[in-house]
Amino acid sequence: MKVSEAALSLLVLILIITSASRSQPKVPEWVNTPSTCCLKYYEKVLPRRLVVGYRKALNCHLPAIIFVTKRNREVCTNPNDDWVQEYIKDPNLPLLPTRNLSTVKIITAKNGQPQLLNSQ
């Protein structure tokens, strides 16, 4: 009898916790959520002809310049690299608005090309 009462109590507790966590309101759109941050840098020089714009992610744990390619891929780069500095000084390369996302994107080299591994 004590075992079934304990099991029933545990089940009720789990249901209460689960329903409470599901009823939590989502964060309103106007709340400033973390912008896209990078976990590591793309190590190679990205061909300039592939880049259509860039974003800054400088307030992250790993500061980065995120280049956006013609295929709408985002490539995390080291803002201290000479080639990155050269690209962002190009007046024909627009600074794009920061995206407010709580996700982290990881870019790595695969077959010499940038590859998006995790996008949302």
UniProtKB/Swiss-Prot annotation:
Cysteine disulfide links: C37-C60, C38-C76
Recorded GO CC terms: extracellular region; extracellular space
Expression (tissue specificity): Mainly expressed in liver, also found in spleen and thymus. Highly expressed in LPS- and IFN-gamma-activated monocytes, weakly in some lymphocytes, including natural killer cells, gamma-delta T-cells, and some T-cell clones.
Keyword NADP: no
Signal peptide: 1-23
InterPro entries, A to Z: Chemokine_b/g/d (IPR039809), Chemokine_CC_CS (IPR000827), Chemokine_IL8-like_dom (IPR001811), Interleukin_8-like_sf (IPR036048)
Keyword Disulfide bond: yes
GO biological process, one term: positive regulation of cell migration
Pfam annotation, one family: IL8
Cited Gene3D superfamilies: 2.40.50.40
Annotated localization: Secreted
Keywords: Chemotaxis, Cytokine, Disulfide bond, Inflammatory response, Secreted, Signal
PROSITE patterns for this protein: SMALL_CYTOKINES_CC
Induction cue: By IL10/interleukin-10.
Homology family: Belongs to the intercrine beta (chemokine CC) family.
Described function: Shows chemotactic activity for lymphocytes and monocytes but not neutrophils. Also shows potent myelosuppressive activity, suppresses proliferation of myeloid progenitor cells. Recombinant SCYA16 shows chemotactic activity for monocytes and THP-1 monocytes, but not for resting lymphocytes and neutrophils. Induces a calcium flux in THP-1 cells that were desensitized by prior expression to RANTES.
Designated name of the protein: C-C motif chemokine 16
Gene that produces this protein: CCL16
